[in-house]
Amino acid sequence: GVSCGAATAASRDSQVAYKAAKVGGTEAMAIGSNWNFAPIVDLLYNWRNTIVQTRSFCADVDRTIEYAKAFIKGTEECDMATTIKHFPGDGTEENDQHLMMGINDMDCDTWMETFGKVYSELIDAGVKTIMAGHIAQPAWQRKIAGKDLDDHEILPATLCPELITGLLKEKLG
């Protein structure tokens, strides 16, 4: 990428996200790529999370949406598809989801006001794809399952029909 999310957000100017995406998209198209696995729309709620620390835009929901929309616009103007990630949201704890399952332990209401708002608004704006993370969201899995699951029954979004079908596809659209 041309710039990381944190550096982009530090500019306090969503046009930086747009311009970085245009440069990256132009370069990627020149070598035959038509799909960008970005932007990262995780929220940095735990500074110890080394995966999200510099890759996310920030902890602010509305600013994250603003920068992501600008990034998506810049990328798609280069005829590239974009991917928002890592559903259901990284950045709340310290686990590296590439090594072990991350756990987004927010309750359903808090999740909807934060990560849910980010995903919902970007889906409504027409983002092309969403990447699931190896991250569990126990509150939503239990709510959609309609029962109190034991901890060993909690699955990451990559393997969880309640999160992918129930939450992402049916509730968020």
Stretch-by-stretch model annotation:
Residues A10-T26, V61-E66, D109-E113:
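Glycine-rich anion/phosphate-binding loops
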Residues G1, A20-Y45, T64-G91:
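Glycine-rich, aromatic-flanked loop segments that form ligand/cofactor-binding clefts
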